[in-house]
């Protein structure tokens, strides 16, 4: 099971480096939940940060790394779960012309919602 973290400064007053350092400390505290990788995403203008410690199960490639951006870069997700029918949904998305860059169920969820 992965470890996830997030924070929001509703007034967007926290500097980006502070957001990043705080979220990095949060995911470091749950390193044991995801030994494969750890990443942080920061949107300083919106006062938000997401982080994840990854336990790679479905897509073992770097393409499955999180936090993950949608193809149009509008959305970001960090997700801990498993979508059992993600291959079926992925085929539907591809048939509808949606770009897919990985074999990750997280990307399927993200692009289905984007």
Labelled PLM ranges:
Residues 1-114:
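N-terminus-centric sequence/structural signature that marks the extreme N-terminus
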């Amino acid at each position: 099971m992965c470890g996830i973290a997030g924070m929001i400064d509703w007034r967007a007053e926290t500097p980006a480096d502070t957001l990043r350092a705080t979220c990095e400390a949060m995911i470091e505290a749950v390193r044991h939940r995801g030994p494969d990788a750890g990443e942080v995403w920061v949107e300083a203008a919106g006062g938000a940060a997401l982080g994840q410690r990854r336990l790679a199960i479905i897509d073992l490639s770097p393409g499955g790394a999180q936090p993950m951006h949608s193809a149009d870069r509008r959305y970001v997700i960090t997700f801990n779960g498993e979508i059992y029918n993600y291959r079926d949904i992925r085929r539907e998305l591809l048939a509808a012309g949606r770009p897919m860059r990985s074999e990750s169920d997280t990307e399927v969820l993200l692009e289905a919602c984007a």
